[in-house]
Amino acid sequence: IRETVGDLGCEIEIEPGRNIVGNAGILLSGVVFLKRGEGRDFLIVDAAMNDLIRPALYQAWMDVSPVQPRDGEARNYDLVGPICETGDFLAKDRELALAEGDLLAVCSAGAYGFVMSSNYNTRGRAAEVLVDGDQAFEVRRRESVQELYAGESLLPT
């Protein structure tokens, strides 16, 4: 940058974010229920917009794959979370062969996943696991409901 604009007399800092670590994160989510609708089928999963807001906020495309591929007829689904909001979706219009209880990998969920997550609807933020080769380390545990209320106080009676 200095070669192009010269010495500006200041320190230049950059924040590369998603470009470096976006593809390093995967959100795992379980299929809770398959709901057939009129003209549209839904996969209700246990992750929600509070865990990964990018699809709802930016209409970001997230690649979604079953952790264990299954034989059978693939259907077109919208992946939605358990929060009762029209924006609670992780992916739309995906061709997948799945059953209740299957585990899904929502890819490219790194970079800003945790910092953009929230406790909306009293949902604890997801755990974070670092995988290095064949080793896995829990680097942040899932928040409990008790932890969400820990900083609150009752009013005196």
Where are these regions (language model features)?
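Charged (often Lys/Glu-rich) extended helix/loop segments that serve as interaction or gating elements
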Residues: 9-157
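Alpha-helix-loop-beta-strand connector modules within alpha/beta enzyme cores
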Residues: 1-7
